[in-house]
Amino acid sequence: MIDIDGSYGEGGGQIVRNAIALSAVTGKATSIKNIRKDRPNPGLSAQHVKAIGIAALLCDAKVEGIKIGSTNIAFFPQEIRGGKYTIDIGTAGSIALLLQCIMPIATYSNTNIKLEIKGGTDVSWAPSIDYLKNVTLSALSKMGYRCNIDILKRGYYPRGGGIVNAIIEPSHLVPDRFSEERGTIRGISHCSNLPEHVAQRQADKAKAILENAGHECSIETCRTDFTSTGSGITLYCGMKGSFVPGKRGTTAEKVGNDAATSLLDELLTPSSVDIHLADQLIPYLGLAEGGSFTVKEISPHTKTNIWVTEKFLDVKFKIEKRNDIVKISIQ
């Protein structure tokens, strides 16, 4: 039994997602206590409960304490199996965050895992589904990871209603020494149940800032009439990206500006990955037993993921400060 203190480090839901994923992959039972202890709403949220429930289905796990508000849980995994699953997170719970828990597990299945997930595609405090598709999966493909994502409907806060199909194939992860990539900045600016000019203004503002800084960019715009009302923009270049959801009272120009300046901040440093991707890569480097990347700084999320990963796997991470960047590798 691997005991995890859920209040360690940043003390958020990512500890739970990472621990459950690694428990399923390694077959090691885990007990997680003090979940989100110091957060305004301690314990498991609805989307955490849903993610753990699906993880349990994938590995036929026995569980204890899996309910909204629970601060102590136990997870007893068995064999991982493929299949087709339909998941409704409810309202605008993040589809990308749920996939962060499921993706490491699915790669160790004996057959493909097909998922239809309903929830939020572009919400605050979570990667957008476009970021997951174009940055996270692009990086993981270098390690042999195979996953295809189709965005059928977008879901915004608070109604959600987005629909994403994902097919994850069994694969063997291999180490990769990620290096910096440059090229044309790409992106998608979108809105639903709003005038088309909202998406266009987001894109125009972002493009103006990026081109003024000397970058070539191509930003697609898209307007739809889905269940929920909202907007957002995701920009990416190599293994760096930014994502900003629109919100009531914030102008389209502000949304585009924030996305562009966030990406520019990452591109100013010669690191290979951005700060968001860095913490997502940690468990995969551990599972591959090798690899390295550089990032502009090590975030609390990344430190926490390293701590959790070292609890489950027989690996040790090395953190080296190099001028204006940080190199993270497996020793």
From Swiss-Prot:
Keywords from the named record: ATP-binding, Cytoplasm, Ligase, Nucleotide-binding
Give yes or no: UniProt keyword Cell cycle: no
Q: GO cellular component terms? A: cytoplasm
Instruction: Kindly identify the residues recorded as the active site.
Output: H301
* A GO biological process held by the record: RNA processing
Catalytic reaction list: a 3'-end 3'-phospho-ribonucleotide-RNA + ATP = a 3'-end 2',3'-cyclophospho-ribonucleotide-RNA + AMP + diphosphate
Q: Which Pfam families match?
A: RTC, RTC_insert
Protein name from the UniProt record: RNA 3'-terminal phosphate cyclase
Q: What does this protein do?
A: Catalyzes the conversion of 3'-phosphate to a 2',3'-cyclic phosphodiester at the end of RNA. The mechanism of action of the enzyme occurs in 3 steps: (A) adenylation of the enzyme by ATP; (B) transfer of adenylate to an RNA-N3'P to produce RNA-N3'PP5'A; (C) and attack of the adjacent 2'-hydroxyl on the 3'-phosphorus in the diester linkage to produce the cyclic end product. The biological role of this enzyme is unknown but it is likely to function in some aspects of cellular RNA processing.
Give a yes or no for keyword rRNA-binding in this entry. Answer: no
Q: What is its EC number?
A: 6.5.1.4
Which terms does the record give in the GO molecular function aspect? ATP binding; RNA-3'-phosphate cyclase activity
- Where is this gene product found? Cytoplasm
The UniProt similarity line reads:
Belongs to the RNA 3'-terminal cyclase family. Type 1 subfamily.
Residues holding ATP: Q100, H276, L277, A278, D279, Q280
